[in-house]
């Protein structure tokens, strides 16, 4: 079982009907993925490890989540006996600010709780082109000790220019991008991006532009590299 801590999952998606979805919601009364991010992550996992059991822990309903919900979700996923916890989310905390330093320590404690229960935590490194192994700002949960922290590569295999990096990044996975000419011409090269699932109740502008049917989109980022690692680990553990 992979626990997905994200924006929820579209349980009505035709390709996710066999994944024995269990849903927990920390933000509102709406079970569906209102944002699309979590369904994209589930799509990557399902492509690599079809029909793996997915438990969804909805900690955000837009671009913002909060640390309290994420901490609760990691504890709940541990108590629910997940094998792997996938966190394709992250934030920066300044170690010189007391409240933020306490938040980092809280994340360390819940990560250690999961690891003591033999659960792997796989988390994204972030997309700000930063070295997350140095400086007063800590990236969490990706970047913490005992977390498998995942950066992103382009189609060519080179580290993506947006991907965070550093000595605490454990592995890099293929996650594409807008293409090498995007910064010069502003044109997106769809061939450089990843195709994945999208909520059937939402419209994906990139999916429409690519003439995909409802339920699919193009995307990229360390968020999508992370479930590649989670799914590969799940496939290995199932052998």
Language model regions located:
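Extracellular S/T/G-rich loop segment that most often corresponds to the catalytic His/Ser-adjacent loop
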Residues: 6, 142-235
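Substrate-binding/access-modulating region of protease and related hydrolase catalytic domains
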Residues: 59-146, 156-159, 209-228
């Amino acid at each position: 079982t992979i626990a997905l801590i994200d924006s929820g999952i579209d349980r009505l998606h035709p390709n996710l009907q066999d994944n024995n979805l269990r849903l927990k919601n920390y933000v509102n009364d709406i079970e569906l993925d209102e944002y699309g991010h979590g369904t994209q992550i589930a799509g990557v996992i399902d492509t690599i490890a079809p029909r793996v059991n997915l438990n969804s822990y909805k900690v955000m309903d837009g671009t913002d989540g909060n640390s309290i919900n994420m901490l609760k979700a990691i504890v709940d996923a541990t108590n629910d006996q997940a094998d792997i916890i996938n966190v394709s989310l992250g934030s920066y905390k300044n170690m010189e600010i007391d409240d933020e330093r306490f938040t980092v320590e809280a994340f360390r404690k819940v990560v250690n709780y999961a690891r003591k229960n033999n659960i792997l935590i796989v988390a994204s490194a972030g997309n700000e082109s930063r070295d997350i192994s140095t400086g007063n700002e800590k990236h969490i949960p990706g970047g913490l000790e005992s977390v498998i922290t995942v950066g992103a590569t382009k189609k060519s295999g080179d580290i993506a220019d947006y991907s965070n990096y550093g000595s605490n990044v454990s592995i890099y996975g293929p996650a594409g991008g807008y293409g090498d000419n995007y910064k010069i011409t502003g044109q997106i090269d769809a061939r450089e991006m990843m195709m994945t699932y999208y909520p059937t109740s939402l419209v994906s502008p990139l999916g429409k532009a690519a003439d995909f049917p409802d339920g699919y989109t193009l995307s990229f980022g360390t968020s999508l590299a992370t479930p590649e690692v989670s799914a590969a680990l799940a496939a290995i553990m199932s052998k």
